[in-house]
């Protein structure tokens, strides 16, 4: 499923049917919202042109979520606004007993396993 916002930013969602308990679903929803919001605010340098992709896969009650954009990548010295949002993401990942990895490769890529 791909949604296009302002005719310039496309969000593609690729997932199987997944079923989460509320203690996991709420943090995952907040994590996705925060990371997509960060992409909208910081990844595209104000030109509002880009792609955001969200992939959630499941195998044997384990989940892997990848959120990536094709923006400028994560800055070496992030602003306080960015770090506050990512700190929230880190806390929520710990809350669901997950692991978070981030890297820059043609944009930002966040891998979350839980």
Question: Where in the sequence are the language-model features?
Answer:
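Conserved short strand/loop->alpha-helix "switch" segment adjacent to the catalytic nucleotide/phosphoryl-transfer site
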Residues: 5-36, 40-50, 80
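Short beta-to-alpha transition helix within the HATPase_c
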Residues: 1-3, 7, 57
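Glycine-rich ATP-binding loops of the HATPase_c
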Residues: 96-107
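Glycine-rich/acidic phosphate-handling loop/turn and adjacent ATP-lid/helix
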Residues: 62-86
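Glycine-rich nucleotide-binding loop
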Residues: 51, 73, 105-111
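Short beta-strand/loop element within the Bergerat-fold HATPase_c
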Residues: 49-61
